[in-house]
Amino acid sequence: MAALGHLAGEAAAAPGPGTPCASRGARLPGPVSSARNPSTVCLCPEQPTCSNADSRAHPLGDEGGTASKKQKNKKKTRNRASVANGGEKASEKLAPEEVPLSAEAQAQQLAQELAWCVEQLELGLKRQKPTPKQKEQAIGAIRTLRSKRTPLPRKRQLMHSLFGDYRAQMEAEWREALRALRAAAYSAQVQPVDGATRKKSQRVCRPRSIWRAKATLDMPDEEFRFNFF
């Protein structure tokens, strides 16, 4: 009986599959409840409350995320700025630099412009019927443009007042003359003719025997001599 009671006591002390262990049940209920519900407060006086720890942990994570995002955005903006600067530099390198004209080229261009303006004034006097006042003004303008004492700004001002944008007019006239020359050169070239056109325009000229007989009859056998008497 004592053995049976001892065995029964051991069986009662041994944990079953559905009953929790005694060592597990020795834990305090406070931390477990706080772990399950983070809004509850721990009973330990030395440790901070769970709600405070959670509230401290989350802002740090948010601040770190925002800081990393800001750094990434800064890097992206720097890369875009460097790419844009590189593209601008490349476009500047590819753009052709305008070479200023030399003194000789400028003098030659000015002489051509003056000659064109003088020629236009002379043609206007010849082809049109100007009034005496217009004729006097045109002659005065020709003298001013041909004079070496007249300063260059005065000549340019006079040409601009008479013809407006004279450089554009000169360029248009030059293009028209070049087009006419090209058309004349193209028309002067000998172009090969196709076989069909040759067959259509082909003609055969054969002399007739009647004309030969008449020519032989009209020619005398005697030698021709001048008869002055």
Swiss-Prot record:
**Compositional bias segments (type: Low complexity):** 1-16
Residues bearing Phosphoserine are 82
Question: Keywords, A to Z?
Answer: Acetylation, Methylation, Phosphoprotein
Q: Where is this region: Disordered?
A: 1-96
Quick check: keyword Phosphoprotein in the entry? yes
Compositionally biased spans, kind Basic residues: 69-79
Which Pfam family name is an example for this entry? Answer: DUF4615
> N-acetylalanine: which positions carry it?
2
Quote the InterPro entries the UniProt record gives: DUF4615
- Write down the superkingdom of origin: Eukaryota
Q: Which residues carry this modification: Omega-N-methylarginine?
A: 27
Q: Which family does it belong to?
A: Belongs to the UPF0488 family.
Any idea what this protein is called?
UPF0488 protein C8orf33
